[in-house]
Amino acid sequence: LYNPDSIAAAIRRLMDGSLFTADELIQHHDLYHSLLHHGSFSAPTADECLERINARLSAGAEFLAAADRIIITFGTSYVYRWKGTGLVVGNCHKMPDSYFRRERLSVDEIADTWLPLMDCIHRRRPTLKWIFTVSPVRHLRDGAHENNLSKSVLLLAIEKIISHYPTIANYFPAYELMMDELRDYRFYAEDMCHPSPAAVRYIGDRFESTYMDAKTIAWLRRAEALHRDLQHRPFRPDSEAHRLFVVKTKLKQDQLRAELPT
């Protein structure tokens, strides 16, 4: 999700835990879709689509209930509204443009959506912290000027939101790091819109040094190494060497899980 309205809708749903129903789906090209979800949730039947969506919703709600921080990244202030209902969609599923109305949210519209949401969550979870960022990915469909206007709206909206909750919300300058410290085009991928791997590492390192202590960073490095091990695809899965690799990987996984705070 990239726009503030859809992100807020997702968090609201995760907090109240209400399951999706068939009347929230649409059928297009022999598939059932949710306008709030990625295409990977779409399915040939409504039941299968809902099963995928609600399983992920339940897992996400459980994860959010245990979280002590929420990191929010706004990508664009442009939204697409489904003409039938006025709903701001998270995914158009490659349907015709004529089904949607495109518009740019204002600073006040974004703040008016997020402030009541955060107030509601803060009353239930007073210790929960928020980290807001603006994505450095450039949305150039309408040109660089429109992208800059869109990002400006996001920056001003976040400033307004944080000013209401200075003790529980702050801003991480991912966008500014890309625009100022990494402004050379060698820090962009070939599409000239996304940050290069080097830029991603640079911004990630700055995030770690801002929000994590040395012990947490060490855990993160171990988790990254473990993730690489788990993604390994053996040439000979029936070999003794691979069996030992699996045993060692499971041991590292158990050790890390035992050390991490619950």
Residue positions per predicted region:
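Extracellular glycan-modifying ectodomains
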Residues: 1-262
